[in-house]
Curated annotation (Swiss-Prot):
Keywords: ATP-binding, Kinase, Nucleotide-binding, Transferase. Its EC number is 2.7.1.12. One of its GO terms (biological process) is carbohydrate metabolic process. The keyword Membrane does not apply. Transmembrane segments: none annotated. The lineage of its organism: Eukaryota, Metazoa, Chordata, Craniata, Vertebrata. Pathway: Carbohydrate acid metabolism; D-gluconate degradation. It comes from the Eukaryota. NCBIfam families: therm_gnt_kin. CDD domains: GntK (cd02021). This is Probable gluconokinase.
Length: 184
């Protein structure tokens, strides 16, 4: 496979996106971004109160992330982004930017990241396993009570998206090895 310019490590809260993403970036020598660092203060407060984010809450955040990816890809800097990217439309915004036009995954003419291919790494797992992880996590603004809302809107990647699916039941070395193998 031709090496992508962007690895998008996605999944629900507690799936291991930040841990896996940071490790992959370190192994590859790529830049790492954690999308959680770019949430507005309003979004953080809303989630901390147990209120799920709406599309309107997420779109400006996704557009900011798109701009970061676009900038780095234009500079030839490969990137690993850890981001929930729960819906297909959210992943499309990360690739294409904008929020006011219908998004089509097969419309490569409007794909600003076309010069830097994107590989989606979908970290999947059962509600019970991930909920158990969230109960162990301390100091994060996303409470375990919001996990069901994430599973409710989750649209796992599918063709024609460029993706691999890796189970969170695997160990961290097994997960990173699966991604590294997919990059060969």
């Amino acid at each position: 496979m031709e090496a992508p310019g962007v690895l998008l490590v996605m999944g629900v809260s507690g799936s291991g996106k930040s841990t896996v993403g940071a490790l992959l970036a370190s192994k590859l020598g790529w830049k790492f971004y954690d999308a959680d660092d770019y949430h507005s203060e309003e979004n953080r407060i809303k989630m901390a109160k147990g209120v799920p984010l709406s599309d309107q809450d997420r779109i400006p955040w996704l557009c900011t992330l798109h701009d970061i990816l676009l900038r780095d890809v234009a500079l030839g800097q490969p990137v690993v982004l850890a981001c929930s990217a729960l819906k297909k439309t959210y992943r499309d915004i990360l690739i294409r930017g904008g929020s006011d036009a219908p998004l089509k995954s097969d419309d490569s003419a409007k794909e600003p990241l076309a010069g830097g291919k994107l590989l989606v790494v979908y970290l999947c797992g059962s509600f019970d396993i991930i909920y158990g992880r969230l109960l162990q996590r301390k100091g994060h603004f996303m409470p375990p009570e919001l996990l069901q809302s994430q599973f409710s809107i989750l649209e796992p990647p599918s063709a024609p998206e460029n993706f691999i699916q890796v189970s969170v039941d695997k160990s961290l070395p097994e997960i990173t090895a699966a991604v590294m193998e997919a990059l060969k």
